[in-house]
Amino acid sequence: MDKTFGIRDPRLTYRDRPGAYLIDITDGRLACVHMHLGYLLPGGGIEAGESREDCIRRECLEETGRTVTIGAPLCAADTYCMHHRLGPFNPIQYYYRGAIGSKVQEPTEPDHTFLWLPLAELSKLYVPQQIWAVRYALEQE
Protein backbone atom coordinates (compact mmCIF):
# COMPACT_ATOMS: atom_id res chain seq x y z
CA MET A 1 0.00 0.00 0.00
CA ASP A 2 1.38 3.40 -0.95
CA LYS A 3 -0.57 5.36 1.69
CA THR A 4 -2.69 4.43 4.70
CA PHE A 5 -5.25 6.83 6.12
CA GLY A 6 -6.52 6.40 9.65
CA ILE A 7 -5.21 4.06 12.31
CA ARG A 8 -6.07 0.37 12.39
CA ASP A 9 -7.47 -0.67 15.77
CA PRO A 10 -6.27 -4.27 16.31
CA ARG A 11 -9.33 -4.98 18.47
CA LEU A 12 -11.69 -4.43 15.54
CA THR A 13 -12.51 -6.54 12.51
CA TYR A 14 -12.65 -4.30 9.46
CA ARG A 15 -14.73 -4.92 6.37
CA ASP A 16 -12.42 -4.59 3.36
CA ARG A 17 -13.89 -3.06 0.20
CA PRO A 18 -11.51 -2.92 -2.77
CA GLY A 19 -12.21 -0.40 -5.50
CA ALA A 20 -10.52 0.90 -8.64
CA TYR A 21 -10.50 4.45 -9.99
CA LEU A 22 -9.38 6.32 -13.09
CA ILE A 23 -7.29 9.49 -13.01
CA ASP A 24 -7.53 11.45 -16.27
CA ILE A 25 -5.86 14.85 -16.13
CA THR A 26 -6.26 16.72 -19.41
CA ASP A 27 -5.57 20.40 -20.10
CA GLY A 28 -5.45 21.29 -16.40
CA ARG A 29 -8.72 19.55 -15.64
CA LEU A 30 -9.66 16.31 -13.91
CA ALA A 31 -12.30 13.89 -15.16
CA CYS A 32 -14.90 13.54 -12.38
CA VAL A 33 -18.44 12.56 -11.65
CA HIS A 34 -20.73 14.66 -9.51
CA MET A 35 -23.38 13.05 -7.32
CA HIS A 36 -25.26 13.90 -4.13
CA LEU A 37 -22.11 13.41 -1.99
CA GLY A 38 -20.01 15.70 -4.17
CA TYR A 39 -17.24 15.20 -6.73
CA LEU A 40 -15.60 11.79 -7.13
CA LEU A 41 -13.16 10.10 -9.48
CA PRO A 42 -14.79 7.72 -11.95
CA GLY A 43 -14.67 4.19 -10.58
CA GLY A 44 -15.99 2.20 -7.68
CA GLY A 45 -16.15 -1.12 -5.91
CA ILE A 46 -14.68 -4.23 -7.50
CA GLU A 47 -17.25 -7.00 -7.94
CA ALA A 48 -16.50 -10.69 -7.31
CA GLY A 49 -14.36 -12.16 -10.10
CA GLU A 50 -13.74 -8.75 -11.65
CA SER A 51 -10.27 -7.35 -12.36
CA ARG A 52 -9.40 -3.81 -11.33
CA GLU A 53 -9.30 -2.74 -14.97
CA ASP A 54 -12.68 -4.35 -15.70
CA CYS A 55 -14.09 -2.55 -12.67
CA ILE A 56 -12.92 0.80 -14.03
CA ARG A 57 -14.38 0.05 -17.47
CA ARG A 58 -17.74 -0.99 -16.00
CA GLU A 59 -17.98 1.85 -13.49
CA CYS A 60 -16.98 4.50 -16.05
CA LEU A 61 -19.60 3.22 -18.47
CA GLU A 62 -22.27 3.19 -15.73
CA GLU A 63 -21.32 6.61 -14.34
CA THR A 64 -20.38 8.52 -17.50
CA GLY A 65 -21.64 6.50 -20.47
CA ARG A 66 -18.11 6.69 -21.89
CA THR A 67 -15.38 4.27 -22.82
CA VAL A 68 -11.96 4.51 -21.18
CA THR A 69 -8.36 3.75 -21.95
CA ILE A 70 -6.58 2.44 -18.87
CA GLY A 71 -2.86 2.90 -18.31
CA ALA A 72 -0.54 1.42 -15.73
CA PRO A 73 -1.35 1.26 -12.02
CA LEU A 74 -0.40 4.51 -10.33
CA CYS A 75 -0.85 4.11 -6.58
CA ALA A 76 -3.06 2.64 -3.87
CA ALA A 77 -4.49 3.82 -0.58
CA ASP A 78 -6.42 2.19 2.22
CA THR A 79 -8.34 3.77 5.05
CA TYR A 80 -9.28 2.54 8.51
CA CYS A 81 -12.49 4.22 9.59
CA MET A 82 -15.89 3.75 11.16
CA HIS A 83 -18.66 3.73 8.57
CA HIS A 84 -22.01 5.06 9.79
CA ARG A 85 -23.82 1.89 8.62
CA LEU A 86 -21.13 -0.77 8.20
CA GLY A 87 -19.04 -0.20 11.32
CA PRO A 88 -15.26 -0.82 11.04
CA PHE A 89 -14.50 -0.26 7.37
CA ASN A 90 -11.38 -0.42 5.19
CA PRO A 91 -11.90 0.87 1.65
CA ILE A 92 -8.88 -0.13 -0.43
CA GLN A 93 -8.55 2.11 -3.47
CA TYR A 94 -6.39 1.34 -6.51
CA TYR A 95 -5.72 4.24 -8.87
CA TYR A 96 -4.84 4.06 -12.57
CA ARG A 97 -3.86 6.74 -15.05
CA GLY A 98 -6.00 6.70 -18.13
CA ALA A 99 -8.21 8.61 -20.50
CA ILE A 100 -11.94 9.07 -20.72
CA GLY A 101 -13.12 8.24 -24.23
CA SER A 102 -16.17 9.01 -26.28
CA LYS A 103 -19.73 8.69 -25.09
CA VAL A 104 -21.33 5.43 -26.25
CA GLN A 105 -24.49 5.39 -24.14
CA GLU A 106 -26.41 7.29 -21.51
CA PRO A 107 -25.10 6.72 -17.98
CA THR A 108 -27.03 4.03 -16.11
CA GLU A 109 -26.50 5.81 -12.80
CA PRO A 110 -28.81 8.82 -13.25
CA ASP A 111 -27.52 10.66 -10.17
CA HIS A 112 -23.99 10.81 -11.64
CA THR A 113 -22.99 13.68 -13.93
CA PHE A 114 -19.69 13.59 -15.82
CA LEU A 115 -17.63 16.79 -15.82
CA TRP A 116 -14.12 18.20 -16.04
CA LEU A 117 -13.08 19.75 -12.72
CA PRO A 118 -10.35 22.42 -12.94
CA LEU A 119 -7.29 21.27 -10.97
CA ALA A 120 -7.50 24.53 -9.01
CA GLU A 121 -10.69 23.06 -7.51
CA LEU A 122 -9.15 19.69 -6.59
CA SER A 123 -10.05 20.20 -2.93
CA LYS A 124 -13.72 19.83 -3.93
CA LEU A 125 -13.26 16.06 -4.28
CA TYR A 126 -15.36 14.38 -1.59
CA VAL A 127 -12.82 11.65 -0.71
CA PRO A 128 -9.48 12.83 0.78
CA GLN A 129 -7.73 9.70 -0.51
CA GLN A 130 -8.69 10.69 -4.04
CA ILE A 131 -7.22 14.17 -3.55
CA TRP A 132 -3.99 12.51 -2.37
CA ALA A 133 -3.96 10.17 -5.41
CA VAL A 134 -4.44 13.03 -7.89
CA ARG A 135 -1.65 15.03 -6.24
CA TYR A 136 0.54 11.92 -6.41
CA ALA A 137 -0.28 11.61 -10.13
CA LEU A 138 0.68 15.25 -10.70
CA GLU A 139 4.02 14.68 -8.94
CA GLN A 140 4.76 11.81 -11.35
CA GLU A 141 4.34 13.98 -14.46
For each predicted feature, which ranges?
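C-terminal lobe/hinge of AMP-binding adenylation domains
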Residues: M35-L37
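Acidic, metal-coordinating catalytic segment for phosphate/diphosphate chemistry
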Residues: M1-Y21
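Unchanged
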Residues: I46-T69, A77-Q130
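Local beta-strand/beta-hairpin segments that build beta-sheet-rich folds
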Residues: M1, L74-C75
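A short gly/proline-enriched turn/hairpin at secondary-structure junctions
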Residues: L40-G44
